[in-house]
Amino acid sequence: VLRAAALFAKLTILILKVATMRVNWKTYNSGKFYDEIISSPGYARKPARGLASYLRSLTHGELLEKKTAADLAIKTMGISFTVYSDAGNIDREWPFDIIPRIIAEKEWDKTSLGLQQRLRAINCFINDIYNEQKIFKDKVVPSELILDSGNFRKECMGIKPRFGVWAHICGSDLIKDGNGDFFVLEDNLRVPSGVSYMLENRRVAKRVFPELFEDAYNIRPITEYPAQLFDTLAAISPRKNKYPEVVVLTPGIYNSAYFEHSFLAQRMGAELVEGSDLVVENDKVYMKTIDGLSQVDVIYRRIDDEFIDPSVFNKDSVLGVSGLFNAWVKGNVALANAPGAGVADDKVIYTYIPKIIKYYLDEDPILPNVESFLCVDKKQCQHVLENLNKLVVKPANESGGYGMLIGPQASKKELEEFARRIKADPRNYMAQPLISLSTVPILGDRVVEPRHVDLRPFVLQADKSYVTPGGLTRVAMVKGSYIVNSSQGGGSKDTWIVSDD
């Protein structure tokens, strides 16, 4: 009994000690990695000094109380995502770390210009390959790479959407290297997701740190995104009515991103529909309502190409609408993103984006790509096979971090299996060196610790462009991990664009 009492007393003292501890930036150590908050032990980078000082003023117990408040807010607000598994679909509460990421506004302004430049060039490229194909004739990009892409849609040949824009919504994944410079890791053009979580992260952060939003920082707002998205969609409406009928087409409640579909429809004031809610008559799309059929002008579709129209693509699809593709071809309805836009989502095509920017815009890329190796090229493929244990290998058309190999963390068996896959289908693989991703602090159980992050800003394009101030910061919650995807254990943070001063 005495021993148990003594143990309990020691545990109580330890808990009280941890609870009253404060963040000690002198002992915070990101090792060889570039940390975005702390430049050297005890010293915060200029834009983050206010945040670092504020966190230092709180005890660890007070920080944990704020974390509990954030968790409760997420639960109350119903912010969730779905994970698919063999055991069934599991709804999970959104993983959120309360310590925000800080980016200086001058740095972000340059990054924003780079993202707009990139999407302009990508849209020129998509419009060209489905029409004149000048880039093939000028031998800038090999035609066989495009025509062999799993996302190339021959059915889209000869089509020219309004403004020549195919990808109206893009989510590009950015990383910072060991020098703190942004690089584009990949472009998501098919059905980019995550923007609702960016918006909800901000709502939660305001609840947790209201005093920082009121006094300390001039943080750029992000709340205008739904309005900007609606304006982008309205701009591509075939009919010039003052209030175009915009709908969000969802696969349904069992889709992993259904929360986002519902969220965006509600915030835009648009109808959330499934394929069964729509019908095509005389090459026009109508929505079924209690008052009869209502013509639809714009469909923000959150369904992959192959499922949007069973009469053209996957004949077994029950998610889309028969006749929808032809209605789009005839110009009677706009689709965002347009069918076929995903051809530029191909990770093999990604390697050509710098050349694509130079070709169509006659500009040097503002944002660089990560060095990449194409397995379809024999010489580069040999390099990849000889250095598999040092590289990250990605399949051309997977997303969410699935199907990839992180060489330095792979077993001998995994390396051998990937070598076999690459040799069997070299067109389907590309490789990149393992970048020393930057770190930011997260709130651990006992101390503040560094973790790796990436960033997904969202870019809109129609008659004009828009970039979210910041984006969805994804963080690897496990020490040493590079996996930031929420479906694989990653978390998220609010992203603050703040003054450099």
Please give the residue ranges for each predicted region:
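Preference for protein termini
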Residues: 1-501
